[in-house]
């Protein structure tokens, strides 16, 4: 969408130089359908995750704190999906006013940063728990986890402020529709470039480097443990999980990040070709579906790595209430690896060496 603006009677009016870009009948049908599916699956799944972690597992571990906050961040975003579904179904006609435009846009931005930051902290926590289980005990406390989550929510809120400030409702004269969109003046390129780079670097590059580094070090520690304990059969599932986590994150977000940056270049007038604008505007909602659907599945994905979580989850589905007594913390395959470099380990110690347990 290439926009030129003017002000008449105090109303912001926009001319769209590529009025047909991204406006395809299949988009107006497919995307609202996908949004609806994401909404139903996401609300159901993340609500159950919150109930299981808070009421059944009693929120006793660092990992459970991060997963709970991840699910809550997803729920905040999911509540705005019906607005975006209606918006797309109405062929990008925004009927909800300027305030909801800002709130819904900020929610999308907030979820991006909060979820990515939480996944990054979760990867660091897994690294500390697995590679340095004894040294990290004093640092991996519930207080530290809760304070970290508060900081993450504040950072995500600050990163979402541009959506509150600069996302507005505009009337496009040559298509006669009202849109909820960012609009940048072509002569002021600093702001959009800064926001675009912030989204790319802070919302993807830095977190991905940290996640990749954390799980690579975990991978090396596990391989070293298997070499030391030669008589213990290798559990390749753990390595598949590590690979899946890294690839899952990368391929979920790369398409959206690429097209988001291209959209900024189009807004600035760096890209003038309407055919390119059409490709970008068509691809953007599809990449959003990929990124945020996978994002909303993350709490379930990480949770189901644990036996206790699966047991409590199935217990909840069967309407079995949580027991009054407290339970041990979240048990996952992605948690604490403890091993001794000794060939005289007991069988129980050998078993725990490769079983990831959140402490």
From Swiss-Prot:
A lipid is attached at residue 355 (S-palmitoyl cysteine). C-terminal Ser or Thr residues may be phosphorylated. Its main location: membrane. Signal peptide: none annotated. The keyword Phosphoprotein applies. Keywords: Cell membrane, Disulfide bond, G-protein coupled receptor, Glycoprotein, Lipoprotein, Membrane, Palmitate, Phosphoprotein, Receptor, Transducer, Transmembrane, Transmembrane helix. Disulfide bonds join 18-274, 101-180. It is found in: Cell membrane. GO terms for biological process: blood vessel development; drinking behavior; inflammatory response; kidney development; maintenance of blood vessel diameter homeostasis by renin-angiotensin; neuron apoptotic process; regulation of blood pressure; regulation of systemic arterial blood pressure by circulatory renin-angiotensin. The keyword Cell membrane applies. GO terms for molecular function: angiotensin type I receptor activity; angiotensin type II receptor activity. Residues 56-61, 126-141, 217-239, 305-359 are cytoplasmic. Belongs to the G-protein coupled receptor 1 family. Interacts with MAS1. Interacts with ARRB1. Interacts with FLNA (via filamin repeat 21); increases PKA-mediated phosphorylation of FLNA. This is Type-1 angiotensin II receptor B. The lineage of its organism: Eukaryota, Metazoa, Chordata, Craniata, Vertebrata. The gene is Agtr1b.
């Amino acid at each position: 969408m290439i926009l030129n603006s003017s002000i008449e009677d105090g109303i912001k009016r926009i001319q769209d130089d590529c009025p047909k870009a991204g406006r395809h009948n299949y988009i107006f049908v497919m995307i609202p359908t996908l949004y609806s599916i994401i909404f139903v699956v996401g609300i159901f799944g993340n609500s159950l995750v919150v109930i299981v972690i808070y009421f059944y597992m009693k929120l006793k571990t660092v990992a459970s704190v991060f997963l709970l906050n991840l699910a809550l961040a997803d729920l905040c975003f999911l509540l705005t999906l019906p607005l975006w579904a209606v918006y797309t179904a109405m062929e990008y006609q925004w009927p909800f006013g300027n305030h909801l435009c800002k709130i819904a846009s900020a929610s999308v931005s907030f979820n991006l940063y909060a979820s990515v930051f939480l996944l990054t902290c979760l990867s660091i926590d897994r690294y500390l728990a697995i590679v340095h289980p004894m040294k990290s005990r004093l640092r991996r406390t519930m207080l530290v986890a809760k304070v970290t989550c508060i900081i993450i929510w504040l950072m995500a809120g600050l990163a979402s402020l541009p959506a509150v400030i600069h996302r507005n409702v505009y009337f496009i004269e040559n298509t006669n529709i009202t849109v909820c969109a960012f609009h940048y003046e072509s002569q002021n390129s600093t702001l959009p470039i800064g926001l675009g780079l912030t989204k790319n670097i802070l919302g993807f590059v830095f977190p991905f480097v940290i996640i990749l580094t954390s799980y690579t070090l975990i991978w090396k520690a596990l391989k070293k443990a298997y070499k030391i304990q030669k008589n213990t059969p290798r559990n390749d599932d753990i390595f598949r999980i590590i690979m899946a986590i890294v690839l899952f994150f990368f391929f979920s977000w790369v398409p959206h990040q690429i097209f988001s940056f291209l959209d900024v270049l189009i807004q600035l007038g760096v890209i003038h070709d309407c055919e390119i604008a059409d490709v970008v505007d068509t691809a953007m909602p599809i990449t959003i579906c990929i990124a945020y659907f996978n994002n909303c599945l993350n709490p379930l994905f990480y949770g189901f790595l644990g036996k206790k979580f699966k047991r409590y989850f199935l217990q909840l589905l069967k309407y079995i209430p949580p027991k009054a007594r407290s339970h041990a913390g979240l048990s996952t395959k992605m948690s604490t690896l403890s091993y001794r470099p000794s060939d005289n380990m007991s069988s129980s110690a050998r078993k725990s060496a490769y079983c990831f347990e959140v402490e």
